[in-house]
Design a protein with these regions (language model features):
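Asp-box/BNR beta-propeller blade signature and adjacent active/binding-site loops
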Residues: 1-282
């Protein structure tokens, strides 16, 4: 790895709060890499040459706590961006759509607001057959479980937010489909009564498990946090050989050093074997 400071616009140093990178392709097959941040006014930079050079464009101007925590491509080639904002004492999840590869975005609208709860940090993804969108959300009161909602019409309407399975209770979910189509979703554990509370974990199960609020197959403690819950916000990738790479910021040593960016690699073949051995011991 190497730093890219010299390639970034000078004003990028003023962008604040969890910059997030997304690749988008417009209807003319033009590819762009976008980096959105939260403040001021959801600023952004863009690269049209695969990240070699970058330029700043006008901010989106959307009021937010955090920028897009999820961007999902729709069947018509447009993209849906989801984020959250403060509304008085409540939190709201909003969505906006781009039809030109990220250059312009529609007026945002609220898609999740739950009395007595605080939905935020949405992660949207497709069902294996591509027909349904699922959106997992952090529940920021941390008094119960995380939240999820579903859409069968490409995000035009969403179901009423409901509790996730206990094992998916946490912050800033991000997931991938493994080569066998099982879901691997990583997050900061916030499940009440969990032995891995505040650590960096992953949930393994099927989409049907999630859709029907079943527990899933098992959970994995990926990394121990030595700074309480100050970890997570992962990136997730599946390599061609099926290896899952989960990357997070975390304080992974009990010393004076602060957080590092750490990647952990595993295959479901390995974790399945560990789970089988554990079950046999029990």
């Amino acid at each position: 790895w190497k730093r890219l400071d010299d390639a970034l616009p000078p004003n990028f140093k003023t962008h604040r709060n969890c910059p997030s990178i997304y690749r988008m392709v417009d209807s003319q097959c033009k590819e762009r890499l976008w980096v959105f941040s939260a403040q001021p006014r959801m600023p952004r930079i863009v690269s049209e040459d695969g990240g070699t050079t970058w330029k700043e464009t006008e901010p989106l101007g959307f009021e937010c706590v955090m920028t897009f925590s999820s961007v999902v491509r729709l069947n018509d080639g447009s993209y849906l961006g989801l984020y959250h904002r403060q509304a008085g004492s409540a939190l709201q999840v909003l969505q906006t759509r781009t039809t030109d590869g990220g250059l312009s975005w529609s007026e945002p609208r609220v898609v999740a607001e739950v009395e007595g709860k605080a939905p935020c940090e949405p992660f949207a993804f497709r069902s294996p057959d591509g027909k349904e969108l699922c959106c997992l959300m952090r529940e920021n009161t941390h008094q119960g479980r995380s939240l999820m909602m579903f859409s069968l019409d490409e995000g035009q309407t969403w179901s009423r937010p409901q509790d996730t399975p206990w094992g998916l209770t946490g912050d800033r979910h991000m997931g991938v489909y493994a080569s066998d189509k099982r879901l691997v979703i990583a997050f900061r554990d916030k499940a009440q009564g969990s032995s891995t509370y505040d650590h960096f974990v992953a949930w393994v199960g099927t989409y049907d498990d999630l859709r029907n609020c079943r527990p899933g197959q098992y959970r994995i403690k990926l990394l121990r946090s030595y700074a309480g819950g100050d970890c997570g916000y992962p990136g997730m990738e599946v390599l061609p050989d099926g290896t899952v790479v989960a990357t997070t910021y975390i304080k992974y040593r009990p010393d004076k050093e602060k957080q590092s960016v750490v990647s952990t690699r595993f295959t479901l073949k390995e974790t399945d074997a560990l789970q089988q051995a554990r079950s046999a011991d029990e």
